[in-house]
Amino acid sequence: MIKLLALDMDGTLLNEAKEIPQAHITAIHQAIEKGVKLVLCTGRPRFGVLPYYKKLGLDLQNEYVIVNNGCSTHQTSDWSLVDWQELSPSDIEYLYDLAEKSDVQLTLFDEEHYFVLGGKPNEIVQNDAKLVFSDLTEISLEEATSGKCRMFQGMFLGTESQTDDFEQRFAGELCQRFSGVRSQPVIYEAMPLGTTKATALSRLAEILKIDSSEIMAMGDANNDIEMLQFAGLGIAMGNASDYVKSLADAVTASNEEDGVARAIEKYIL
Protein backbone atom coordinates (compact mmCIF):
# COMPACT_ATOMS: atom_id res chain seq x y z
CA MET A 1 0.00 0.00 0.00
CA ILE A 2 1.37 3.40 -1.01
CA LYS A 3 1.57 5.85 1.91
CA LEU A 4 3.82 8.53 0.40
CA LEU A 5 3.93 10.01 -3.09
CA ALA A 6 7.24 11.68 -4.02
CA LEU A 7 6.91 13.87 -7.10
CA ASP A 8 9.54 15.64 -9.15
CA MET A 9 8.32 18.94 -10.59
CA ASP A 10 9.91 20.02 -13.89
CA GLY A 11 9.23 17.39 -16.54
CA THR A 12 6.94 15.47 -14.17
CA LEU A 13 4.30 17.43 -12.25
CA LEU A 14 4.67 20.37 -14.66
CA ASN A 15 3.99 20.21 -18.38
CA GLU A 16 6.30 21.81 -20.94
CA ALA A 17 4.54 25.17 -20.46
CA LYS A 18 5.60 24.98 -16.77
CA GLU A 19 1.98 24.61 -15.68
CA ILE A 20 0.27 21.95 -13.54
CA PRO A 21 -2.37 20.11 -15.60
CA GLN A 22 -5.79 20.03 -13.93
CA ALA A 23 -5.76 16.23 -14.16
CA HIS A 24 -2.64 16.18 -11.97
CA ILE A 25 -4.23 18.50 -9.39
CA THR A 26 -7.38 16.39 -9.20
CA ALA A 27 -5.49 13.09 -8.86
CA ILE A 28 -3.18 14.50 -6.17
CA HIS A 29 -6.14 15.68 -4.10
CA GLN A 30 -7.76 12.25 -4.45
CA ALA A 31 -4.55 10.58 -3.25
CA ILE A 32 -4.29 12.92 -0.25
CA GLU A 33 -7.94 12.20 0.61
CA LYS A 34 -6.95 8.52 0.78
CA GLY A 35 -4.32 9.41 3.39
CA VAL A 36 -1.26 9.49 1.12
CA LYS A 37 1.42 12.04 2.08
CA LEU A 38 2.57 14.26 -0.79
CA VAL A 39 6.24 15.22 -1.00
CA LEU A 40 7.39 17.39 -3.89
CA CYS A 41 11.07 16.58 -4.57
CA THR A 42 12.73 19.13 -6.79
CA GLY A 43 15.95 20.80 -7.76
CA ARG A 44 14.13 24.11 -7.46
CA PRO A 45 14.68 26.35 -4.45
CA ARG A 46 11.83 26.93 -2.01
CA PHE A 47 10.81 30.22 -3.63
CA GLY A 48 10.53 28.41 -6.97
CA VAL A 49 8.01 25.96 -5.48
CA LEU A 50 5.68 28.23 -3.48
CA PRO A 51 3.54 29.56 -6.37
CA TYR A 52 2.93 26.01 -7.63
CA TYR A 53 2.05 24.78 -4.17
CA LYS A 54 -0.62 27.45 -3.96
CA LYS A 55 -1.93 26.39 -7.37
CA LEU A 56 -2.23 22.86 -6.04
CA GLY A 57 -4.53 24.26 -3.36
CA LEU A 58 -2.39 22.75 -0.61
CA ASP A 59 -0.78 25.86 0.82
CA LEU A 60 -0.28 25.61 4.60
CA GLN A 61 -1.40 21.98 4.78
CA ASN A 62 0.83 19.60 6.72
CA GLU A 63 2.78 18.16 3.80
CA TYR A 64 6.49 18.32 2.95
CA VAL A 65 8.66 19.68 0.16
CA ILE A 66 12.24 18.60 -0.57
CA VAL A 67 14.05 21.33 -2.50
CA ASN A 68 17.54 22.07 -3.83
CA ASN A 69 17.91 18.43 -4.91
CA GLY A 70 17.70 17.13 -1.36
CA CYS A 71 19.66 19.86 0.42
CA SER A 72 16.66 21.15 2.37
CA THR A 73 13.26 19.88 3.48
CA HIS A 74 10.37 22.14 4.52
CA GLN A 75 7.13 21.40 6.34
CA THR A 76 4.39 23.23 4.46
CA SER A 77 2.18 24.06 7.45
CA ASP A 78 4.52 26.96 8.21
CA TRP A 79 7.33 26.41 5.64
CA SER A 80 9.82 25.80 8.42
CA LEU A 81 13.09 24.04 7.65
CA VAL A 82 13.04 20.53 9.14
CA ASP A 83 16.18 19.04 7.58
CA TRP A 84 19.12 20.41 5.63
CA GLN A 85 22.65 19.92 4.33
CA GLU A 86 24.79 22.95 3.55
CA LEU A 87 27.98 23.91 1.75
CA SER A 88 30.96 25.02 3.84
CA PRO A 89 32.94 28.18 3.01
CA SER A 90 35.78 25.99 1.70
CA ASP A 91 33.27 24.12 -0.50
CA ILE A 92 32.14 27.42 -1.99
CA GLU A 93 35.73 28.53 -2.60
CA TYR A 94 36.40 25.26 -4.42
CA LEU A 95 33.30 25.60 -6.61
CA TYR A 96 34.18 29.22 -7.38
CA ASP A 97 37.66 28.16 -8.49
CA LEU A 98 36.17 25.60 -10.90
CA ALA A 99 33.87 28.23 -12.39
CA GLU A 100 36.82 30.60 -12.86
CA LYS A 101 38.64 27.88 -14.82
CA SER A 102 35.69 27.37 -17.17
CA ASP A 103 33.06 29.24 -19.19
CA VAL A 104 30.11 28.41 -16.91
CA GLN A 105 28.81 30.67 -14.14
CA LEU A 106 28.42 29.67 -10.49
CA THR A 107 25.17 30.34 -8.64
CA LEU A 108 24.28 29.58 -5.01
CA PHE A 109 21.04 29.31 -3.04
CA ASP A 110 19.98 30.02 0.49
CA GLU A 111 16.34 29.94 1.68
CA GLU A 112 15.44 33.30 0.16
CA HIS A 113 17.98 34.23 -2.53
CA TYR A 114 19.32 33.19 -5.91
CA PHE A 115 22.95 34.35 -5.75
CA VAL A 116 25.26 34.73 -8.73
CA LEU A 117 29.06 34.93 -8.45
CA GLY A 118 31.69 36.04 -10.92
CA GLY A 119 30.17 39.16 -12.42
CA LYS A 120 26.97 39.92 -14.29
CA PRO A 121 24.62 36.95 -14.75
CA ASN A 122 24.75 35.31 -18.16
CA GLU A 123 21.58 34.85 -20.21
CA ILE A 124 21.07 31.26 -19.07
CA VAL A 125 21.26 32.28 -15.41
CA GLN A 126 18.76 35.08 -16.07
CA ASN A 127 16.34 32.67 -17.76
CA ASP A 128 16.65 30.13 -14.95
CA ALA A 129 15.91 32.78 -12.33
CA LYS A 130 12.70 33.68 -14.18
CA LEU A 131 11.63 30.03 -14.12
CA VAL A 132 11.88 29.99 -10.32
CA PHE A 133 10.25 33.42 -9.88
CA SER A 134 13.38 35.00 -8.44
CA ASP A 135 15.42 38.14 -8.75
CA LEU A 136 19.17 37.64 -8.94
CA THR A 137 21.52 38.86 -6.22
CA GLU A 138 25.13 39.44 -7.26
CA ILE A 139 27.50 38.41 -4.49
CA SER A 140 31.27 38.35 -4.04
CA LEU A 141 33.22 35.28 -2.99
CA GLU A 142 34.01 37.03 0.30
CA GLU A 143 30.30 37.57 0.98
CA ALA A 144 29.42 34.03 -0.09
CA THR A 145 31.92 32.51 2.33
CA SER A 146 31.21 34.84 5.28
CA GLY A 147 28.86 32.36 6.95
CA LYS A 148 26.04 34.90 7.08
CA CYS A 149 23.91 32.80 4.70
CA ARG A 150 23.23 29.08 4.85
CA MET A 151 24.20 28.01 1.31
CA PHE A 152 22.54 24.76 0.28
CA GLN A 153 23.55 24.11 -3.30
CA GLY A 154 25.76 25.32 -6.12
CA MET A 155 24.82 25.33 -9.80
CA PHE A 156 27.02 25.86 -12.83
CA LEU A 157 25.14 27.32 -15.80
CA GLY A 158 26.24 27.84 -19.38
CA THR A 159 25.34 26.87 -22.91
CA GLU A 160 25.01 23.16 -23.55
CA SER A 161 28.49 23.02 -25.10
CA GLN A 162 29.99 25.02 -22.21
CA THR A 163 28.31 22.70 -19.70
CA ASP A 164 29.51 19.66 -21.68
CA ASP A 165 33.06 21.01 -21.45
CA PHE A 166 32.72 21.70 -17.73
CA GLU A 167 31.38 18.22 -17.04
CA GLN A 168 34.10 16.51 -19.08
CA ARG A 169 36.89 18.49 -17.41
CA PHE A 170 35.75 18.68 -13.80
CA ALA A 171 32.95 16.22 -12.95
CA GLY A 172 35.28 13.39 -11.96
CA GLU A 173 37.20 15.62 -9.58
CA LEU A 174 34.11 17.41 -8.28
CA CYS A 175 32.24 14.20 -7.48
CA GLN A 176 34.97 13.11 -5.06
CA ARG A 177 33.96 16.00 -2.81
CA PHE A 178 30.32 16.71 -3.73
CA SER A 179 27.19 15.03 -5.06
CA GLY A 180 27.23 16.25 -8.65
CA VAL A 181 24.56 15.79 -11.31
CA ARG A 182 23.90 17.08 -14.82
CA SER A 183 20.26 17.87 -14.15
CA GLN A 184 19.65 19.72 -17.42
CA PRO A 185 21.61 20.27 -20.64
CA VAL A 186 22.63 23.75 -19.44
CA ILE A 187 22.99 23.03 -15.69
CA TYR A 188 25.47 21.03 -13.62
CA GLU A 189 24.63 20.93 -9.92
CA ALA A 190 26.81 20.39 -6.86
CA MET A 191 25.38 19.46 -3.46
CA PRO A 192 27.11 18.46 -0.21
CA LEU A 193 28.60 14.97 -0.58
CA GLY A 194 26.00 12.23 -0.22
CA THR A 195 23.07 14.59 -0.75
CA THR A 196 20.38 13.57 -3.24
CA LYS A 197 16.60 13.65 -3.39
CA ALA A 198 16.74 10.04 -2.16
CA THR A 199 18.80 10.75 0.96
CA ALA A 200 16.44 13.56 1.98
CA LEU A 201 13.42 11.37 1.24
CA SER A 202 14.92 8.55 3.30
CA ARG A 203 15.39 10.81 6.33
CA LEU A 204 11.87 12.20 5.98
CA ALA A 205 10.41 8.70 5.67
CA GLU A 206 12.10 7.78 8.96
CA ILE A 207 10.50 10.79 10.66
CA LEU A 208 7.09 9.82 9.25
CA LYS A 209 7.66 6.12 10.03
CA ILE A 210 7.03 5.14 6.43
CA ASP A 211 8.98 2.28 4.86
CA SER A 212 10.58 2.71 1.44
CA SER A 213 8.32 -0.10 0.16
CA GLU A 214 5.35 2.19 0.87
CA ILE A 215 6.71 5.04 -1.28
CA MET A 216 5.87 5.75 -4.91
CA ALA A 217 8.27 8.17 -6.62
CA MET A 218 7.96 9.75 -10.05
CA GLY A 219 10.55 11.62 -12.12
CA ASP A 220 12.11 12.15 -15.51
CA ALA A 221 15.71 13.30 -15.14
CA ASN A 222 19.13 12.19 -13.93
CA ASN A 223 18.64 13.88 -10.56
CA ASP A 224 15.59 11.65 -9.98
CA ILE A 225 17.39 8.33 -10.44
CA GLU A 226 18.35 7.69 -6.80
CA MET A 227 14.83 8.59 -5.69
CA LEU A 228 13.25 6.22 -8.21
CA GLN A 229 15.54 3.44 -7.04
CA PHE A 230 14.96 4.15 -3.33
CA ALA A 231 11.17 4.04 -3.58
CA GLY A 232 9.33 0.75 -3.48
CA LEU A 233 7.70 1.84 -6.74
CA GLY A 234 9.79 4.09 -8.97
CA ILE A 235 7.97 5.40 -12.04
CA ALA A 236 9.68 7.17 -14.93
CA MET A 237 7.77 9.67 -17.03
CA GLY A 238 7.19 8.92 -20.69
CA ASN A 239 9.37 11.94 -21.53
CA ALA A 240 12.32 10.58 -19.51
CA SER A 241 15.47 9.38 -21.26
CA ASP A 242 15.81 5.70 -22.10
CA TYR A 243 18.47 5.47 -19.39
CA VAL A 244 16.17 6.79 -16.66
CA LYS A 245 13.36 4.53 -17.90
CA SER A 246 15.66 1.50 -17.74
CA LEU A 247 16.25 2.11 -14.01
CA ALA A 248 12.58 2.56 -13.07
CA ASP A 249 10.06 -0.10 -12.05
CA ALA A 250 7.45 1.23 -14.47
CA VAL A 251 6.89 3.95 -17.06
CA THR A 252 3.84 6.20 -17.27
CA ALA A 253 2.69 8.66 -19.93
CA SER A 254 4.59 11.90 -20.52
CA ASN A 255 4.16 15.19 -18.68
CA GLU A 256 2.17 16.39 -21.70
CA GLU A 257 -0.20 13.41 -21.41
CA ASP A 258 -1.17 13.62 -17.72
CA GLY A 259 1.39 10.98 -16.79
CA VAL A 260 1.26 11.76 -13.06
CA ALA A 261 -2.53 11.48 -12.94
CA ARG A 262 -2.48 8.20 -14.85
CA ALA A 263 0.05 6.67 -12.47
CA ILE A 264 -1.85 7.83 -9.38
CA GLU A 265 -5.06 6.36 -10.79
CA LYS A 266 -3.33 3.06 -11.57
CA TYR A 267 -1.28 2.52 -8.42
CA ILE A 268 -2.97 4.53 -5.63
CA LEU A 269 -6.67 5.15 -6.28
Where do the protein language model's features map onto the residues?
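Short active-site oxyanion
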Residues: 35-39, 61-63, 153, 213-214, ...
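Short, structured coil segments at secondary-structure junctions
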Residues: 56, 61, 69, 174-176, ...
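Short, flexible loop segments at the rims of nucleotide/cofactor-binding pockets, characterized by
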Residues: 14-18, 43, 84-85, 229
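Hydrophobic packing residues within well-ordered alpha-helices of enzyme cores
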Residues: 24, 49-53, 166, 170, ...
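Conserved acidic, metal-coordinating active-site core of Asp-based
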Residues: 98, 102-218
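Mg2+-dependent phosphoryl-transfer enzymes with acidic/Ser/Thr/Gly-rich catalytic loops
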Residues: 1-4, 21, 189-269
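Asp-based phosphoryl-transfer active-site loop
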Residues: 3-17
